[in-house]
Amino acid sequence: MRRHLILLGLAAFVTCAPLAAMAQEYVLTIKDHKFTPEELKVPANQRVVITVINNDSTAEEFESSVLKVEKVIAGNSRGTVRIGPLAPGRYPFIGEFHEATAKGVVIAE
């Protein structure tokens, strides 16, 4: 009986541990070659997942040299990037295919 309780406790720990490590999810939308929101606030010192939804018919590349990420998002589709943990600060990003209009910043606070 004691062995069963230990195994049950271990199974519960293994099952719940990944939930605690899950990153918070944030959404960026691309429309008319612009990111919305232009400023994305995320918690500092935590991993985050950014889902980029491209509502334009053409592809866009989410790129940030300081975040060390490049991800091409096809037109009318979505993609996911994982970043962090980030120290408090501002981390600019661009849409490389439309740099004049597709700009934004991740703000870790």
Go through each PLM region and give its residues:
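Bacterial N-terminal signal peptides that target proteins for export
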Residues: 1-9
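Histidine- and aromatic-enriched segments that form or immediately flank copper-ligand environments
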Residues: 57-75, 104
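Asparagine-centered strand-capping/turn motif at beta-strand->loop junctions
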Residues: 52-54
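Sec/Tat signal peptide C-region and signal peptidase I cleavage site
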Residues: 16-23
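N-terminal edge beta-strand
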Residues: 23-45
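Extracellular/periplasmic metallocenter environments
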Residues: 27, 74-109
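N-terminal post-signal-peptidase region of extra-cytosolic proteins
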Residues: 31-38, 66-68, 76-81, 92
